[in-house]
Amino acid sequence: MTIKEEKYSPNQTIDGMLPKSWFIDEKHRRLLIKGTYEFSKQELINEYLATQITKRLNMAHCPYEVRIWQGKLVSVCENFLKGDQEIITANDIYDLRKKKNYVSDYEHYLEILAAHGLADARNELENMLVLDFLMMNHDRHMKNFGIIRNVKTLEWEKVAPIYDTGQAMNCDKLTKEMNFFEGRGKLFFNTKKKFSTYQKLIHDWSRFDFEKLADLPEEYEAILRQYQAYTQMPDSRIEKQGAGLKWRIANLQSYSQ
């Protein structure tokens, strides 16, 4: 892959803890290349896992690839914004109108999106919640989701595709501390929301065919082994990752029936 560094970022809202930079490849595509900071170096492969889940469940998502660049493991994704688009995050959207006392943060946000003509907002947010449940994503802060706006007309065009799901699958835990049966994530201002409460927010389970994920735990283990030389991840952790993902898929499938 031949790439050159991009001087100007396509969007200044991109931030976070991971080392990252925009580049242009030989096909003139703007690519975001991200590194890792967790000891497990697992965030990058988690992005691949998120891509596989969202693809199989037909969710709008930003696809990620795992690559070796300059001798290091990185994740690569193409810029999902066009030249006349920008992303407005939930962090900036939430305060556009005053929240009613009897309305949850989640419903308040959906009301704002519906008022701007995004009729499919609930389904898109439910997709994100399903993904975060399956992967135990603990870092869905309010700058990690939003909408896409036209910079010329200021029209809200659509809900942004799912992106940035690396902080998941117990990547910050020692192998002996990993727990795939219970955990907590972030949803708006609740930074310790139990994943077990996410299912109650899903209105239409018929949209999800979890049978399409049946062989994914084995595929996830395979790619963890493929890059084992770079992550130094022990076999015991890889096996626990696959078993944990398998349990969470089965748990959600059982709940949805």
Where are these regions (language model features)?
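A broad, structural surface signal
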Residues: 48-56, 123, 127-131, 243, ...
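ATP-dependent phospho-/nucleotidyl transfer catalytic cores
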Residues: 79-129, 251-252
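Conserved ATP-binding subdomain of kinase catalytic cores across diverse folds
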Residues: 1-96
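Conserved kinase catalytic-core segment
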Residues: 105-174
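Hydrophobic faces of stable alpha-helices that mediate helix-helix packing
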Residues: 20, 103-106, 217
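C-terminal catalytic region of ATP-dependent kinase domains
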Residues: 36, 55, 152-257
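Ferredoxin-like alpha/beta domains used as RNA- or RNAP-binding modules
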Residues: 11, 19, 72, 128, ...
